Amino acid sequence: MGSRWGIAVLGLFCFVSCLEAITSSPKIQVYSRHPAQIGESNNLNCYVSSFHPPQISIRLLKNGQEMPGVEMSDLSFSNDWTFHRLVHTVFTPSNQDTFECEVVHEGVKKTVKWEPDN
């Protein structure tokens, strides 16, 4: 009986370890809430999805500097156990400024630039 428990515990440990070993790189989408108008206030959104494990850093940048007033949704997960999160702030597009979303996941940094709608 004792060896059965040992095998069951070992099997459970291996199963949990395998779940922790699965990683999925994030997909990043950067977009404005409304079509961009130079000089008019808008919302800048960065939607990060399909990532695992859930530990992640997401920053919105203006000219390479972290933007103030950034808000983020709760971390949520999908049916496949990957996670997603929306990060957003108010911004005013201009011809001189660049806006980006910087994501660091599992030690890998990705930066996606916002492009105005045409």
Curated annotation (Swiss-Prot):
Compartments where found: Secreted
Stretch forming the signal peptide: 1-21
Source lineage: Eukaryota, Metazoa, Chordata, Craniata, Vertebrata
Any one Pfam family match given in the protein's UniProt record, by short name: C1-set
GO cellular component: extracellular region; late endosome membrane; lysosomal membrane; MHC class I protein complex; MHC class II protein complex
Assembly and interaction partners: Heterodimer of an alpha chain and a beta chain. Beta-2-microglobulin is the beta-chain of major histocompatibility complex class I molecules.
Gene Ontology molecular function: MHC class II protein complex binding; peptide antigen binding
Similarity remark: Belongs to the beta-2-microglobulin family.
SMART domains assigned: IGc1
Disulfide pattern: 46-101
Record's protein name: Beta-2-microglobulin
Protein function: Component of the class I major histocompatibility complex (MHC). Involved in the presentation of peptide antigens to the immune system.
Listed GO biological process terms: antigen processing and presentation of exogenous peptide antigen via MHC class II; antigen processing and presentation of peptide antigen via MHC class I; peptide antigen assembly with MHC class II protein complex; positive regulation of immune response; positive regulation of T cell activation
Boundaries of every Ig-like C1-type domain copy: 26-113
Organism: Ornithorhynchus anatinus (Duckbill platypus)
Keywords noted in UniProt: Disulfide bond, Immunity, Immunoglobulin domain, MHC I, Secreted, Signal
